[in-house]
């Protein structure tokens, strides 16, 4: 609800000072692999034997909520509660924890508790949320590892709402904490509140959702501080859509959130001290120390506006809409100099946060007035105004979606307050309703699949396309559900719709003819298993690829097609694919690393998968780029051997992004390649990995490592399985 909109706008968010120059300083264009090694076990103080879900199951949630409810009205002298209630502060904390989520790549959100780390803990829009986290510390300290910070942020927001008379939709635990900042692209700007992310007619760059560096959503004063409600509505619609909210959900969230609390702009924002990451050691991670008055309470400065929306800011009500429509609004400025709106011809009716004897005039933000003056938002707002119960239900559902959107399927939800109702945005999959196939069935089905006339490339590419939609960021996608046969995935260019239809038709026929029920989702993955075992055997290595049945097939009615559109790859370096119809905002090799990170792969896993998929002939469109073998369909290490040989000289071809590998002696073209292929020979770290697999004694290691990485991708969305290392079993 609060936001900094004009103070310190030119300050660089990167700390400066004498420091040794690293590789990125010398070679800024060097491909960065560090995102593949985030969440390292070595950074986790709890160790590999700690399982958060098991700890959460021992939590006394009722007692925890009672403690949180008591905290809401236990005002502290070092940061007094507005209106004697911390509800508005904790709603904002939870909202801003979840509100970084973006649909384009599924990153951000509340799932990892990243708000306590840089840069989020120091974003202008998160000013003074450090105080909310410190207020929570005694409770976190009391309950220890039974509740993660990530879960506690969301739960505190829920309890805040409930303590002020609102009935929430539910709460699910299960967000395990991370222990270091995630390396994530938040924008190209080098200053807080910069907006270089726009081009043309205010076209917001992908994958970003917020309008300016350091904001969660939009500038509350209007686009770039311009108090234009209609312009603000355009920004709101764009940025809320990018975090998976439609118009109705957007109105419900803004109006519902702004039913409570206030913004803080009591004085000159230039009197604020540095953000937490910019403070001195004695500040102990508390930022934004203010020299204005007492620095807190009635003198608090969080951002520019000083707005109170409701006559009862610690109680669920319809006052927001009542004020929005009852009054005409006049542009004014806050004590901090920010643009905001005050009710015309009104009597003071909203309470002062610290002096019960005082009343103020109702006030609104430019982004609030967008809900009245945008014709689409106005229609929804008026309906909610006239139907308070409908508004309450819409806000409850939208709040639940906001705070749970990046948790993935309901199978990951924990606790007694998980809603019984299944929601479409949760990507529901039917429960297993049949006896699963056994080992003998698996072998029989593999034989039938290999005898169906489908090639190794057909089976591998179909299984890969089905499973590789998985995003570890928001736990969406994956092979479970077999949504590759449904709209929109069945029509994606990368999936080669005609070939896909043929493969699926044959697999479905095999399933129908088999004596036991088996899902198409399982058959798709099993087809890949059978193909890889055959390809490895043809390379002289006997291996049994792990397979775990238990996937089910989702229906089209269980699939929100528009919400799956962002999962369509702009590029898939694993299959040497670039979608020419989509804007590419990364180099091909950067897109490969980005996709590998979403698949939760390490650099070695990414390397071995690319090398294996190339020789298996799994390229999109049957492209020959990077197929450095004379035996396609055989799981050999030829890709690495032929890439690293000095017998080949590489040079650009006449086609952009395509390279020719010529025999150094004859000049004959032997291979063609993309940037994704050649990066494994040009990048020193990737070359070191490629060398491992090109060595003469790595024949079996290559196959085993490929199978392990492949199985990891196939099972990425199997939250019903216990996460254990993939153990390879030699075939008989």
UniProtKB/Swiss-Prot annotation:
Biological source species: Rhodopseudomonas palustris (strain BisB18)
EC numbers for this chain: 1.11.1.21
Name of encoding gene: katG
Name assigned to this protein: Catalase-peroxidase
Pfam families attached to this UniProt entry: peroxidase
Annotated positions for site Transition state stabilizer: 92
Post-translational modifications reported in the UniProt record: Formation of the three residue Trp-Tyr-Met cross-link is important for the catalase, but not the peroxidase activity of the enzyme.
Cofactor binding: number and manner: Binds 1 heme b (iron(II)-protoporphyrin IX) group per dimer.
Compositionally biased intervals (Basic and acidic residues): 1-10
HAMAP family: Catal_peroxid (MF_01961)
GO molecular function annotation: catalase activity; heme binding; metal ion binding
Enzyme class: oxidoreductase
Keyword match DNA-binding: no
GO CC annotation, single: cytosol
Residue spans crossing the bilayer: none
Record-listed heme b binding positions: 258
Stored PANTHER family: CATALASE-PEROXIDASE, HYDROPEROXIDASE I, BIFUNCTIONAL CATALASE-PEROXIDASE
């Amino acid at each position: 609800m609060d936001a900094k909109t004009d103070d310190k706008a030119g300050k660089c968010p990167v700390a400066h000072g004498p420091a040794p120059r690293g590789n990125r300083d010398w070679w800024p264009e060097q491909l960065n692999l560090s995102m593949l090694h985030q969440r390292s076990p070595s950074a986790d103080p709890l160790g590999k034997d700690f399982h958060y879900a098991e700890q959460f199951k021992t939590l006394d949630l009722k007692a925890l909520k009672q403690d949180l409810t008591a905290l809401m009205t236990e005002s502290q002298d070092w940061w007094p509660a507005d209106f004697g209630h911390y509800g508005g502060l904790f709603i904002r904390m939870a909202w801003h924890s979840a509100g970084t989520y973006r649909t384009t790549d599924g990153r951000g959100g509340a799932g990892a508790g990243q708000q306590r780390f840089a840069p989020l803990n120091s974003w202008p829009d998160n000013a003074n949320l450090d105080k909310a986290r410190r207020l929570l510390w005694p409770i976190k300290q009391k309950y220890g590892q039974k509740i993660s910070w990530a879960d506690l942020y969301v739960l505190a927001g829920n309890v805040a709402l409930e303590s002020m008379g609102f009935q929430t939709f539910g709460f699910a635990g299960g967000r395990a904490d991370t222990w270091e900042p995630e390396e994530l692209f938040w924008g190209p700007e080098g200053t807080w509140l910069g907006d270089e992310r726009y081009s043309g007619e205010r076209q917001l760059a992908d994958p970003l959702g917020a309008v300016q560096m350091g904001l969660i959503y939009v500038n509350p004063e209007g686009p770039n501080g311009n108090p234009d409600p209609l312009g603000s509505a355009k920004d709101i619609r764009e940025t809320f859509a990018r975090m998976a909210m439609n118009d109705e959900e957007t109105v419900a969230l803004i109006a519902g959130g702004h039913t409570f609390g206030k913004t803080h702009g009591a004085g000159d924002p230039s009197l604020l001290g540095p953000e937490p990451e910019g403070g001195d050691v004695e500040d102990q991670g508390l930022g934004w120390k203010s020299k204005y008055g007492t620095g807190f309470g009635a003198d608090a400065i969080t951002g520019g506006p000083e707005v109170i929306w409701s006559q009862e800011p610690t109680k669920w009500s319809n006052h927001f809409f009542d004020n929005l429509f009852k009054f005409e609004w006049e542009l004014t400025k806050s004590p901090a100099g920010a643009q905001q709106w005050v009710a015309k011809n009104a009597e003071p009716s909203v309470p002062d946060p610290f002096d019960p004897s005082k009343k103020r005039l109702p006030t609104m933000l430019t982004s609030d007035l967008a809900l009245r003056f945008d014709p689409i938002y106005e229609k929804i707002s008026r309906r909610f105004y006239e139907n308070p119960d409908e508004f309450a239900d819409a806000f409850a559902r939208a709040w639940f979606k906001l705070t749970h959107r990046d948790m993935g399927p309901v199978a990951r939800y924990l606790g007694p307050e998980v809603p019984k109702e299944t929601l479409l945005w949760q990507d529901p999959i039917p429960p297993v309703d049949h006896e699963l196939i056994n080992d003998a069935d698996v072998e029989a089905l593999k034989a039938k699949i290999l005898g169906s006339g489908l090639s190794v490339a057909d089976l591998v590419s179909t299984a890969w396309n089905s499973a590789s939609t998985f995003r570890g960021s928001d736990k969406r996608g994956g092979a479970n559900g077999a949504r590759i046969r449904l709209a929109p995935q069945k029509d994606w260019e990368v999936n080669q719709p005609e070939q896909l239809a043929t493969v699926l038709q044959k697999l479905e026929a095999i399933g129908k003819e088999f004596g036991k029920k088996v899902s198409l989702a399982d058959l798709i993955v099993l087809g890949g298993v059978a193909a890889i075992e055959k390809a490895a055997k043809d390379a002289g290595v006997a291996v049994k690829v792990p397979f775990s049945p238990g996937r089910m097939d989702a229906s089209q009615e269980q699939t929100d097609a528009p919400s799956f559109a962002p999962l369509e790859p702009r590029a898939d370096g694993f299959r040497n694919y670039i979608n020419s119809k989509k804007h590419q905002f990364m180099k091909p090799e950067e897109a490969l690393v980005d996709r590998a990170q979403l698949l939760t792969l390490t650099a070695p896993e990414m390397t071995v998968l690319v090398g294996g998929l190339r020789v298996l002939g799994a390229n999109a469109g049957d492209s020959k780029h990077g197929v450095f073998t004379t035996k396609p369909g055989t799981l050999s290490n030829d890709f690495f051997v032929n890439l690293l040989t000095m017998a080949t000289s590489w040079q650009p071809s006449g086609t952009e992004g395509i390279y020719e590998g010529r025999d150094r002696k004859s000049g004959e073209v032997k291979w063609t390649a993309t940037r994704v292929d050649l990066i494994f020979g040009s990048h020193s770290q990737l070359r070191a990995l490629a060398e491992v697999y090109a060595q003469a004694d790595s024949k079996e290691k290559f196959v085993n490592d490929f199978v392990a990485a492949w199985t990891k991708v196939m099972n990425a969305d199997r939250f019903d399985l216990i996460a254990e290392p993939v153990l390879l079993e030699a075939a008989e």
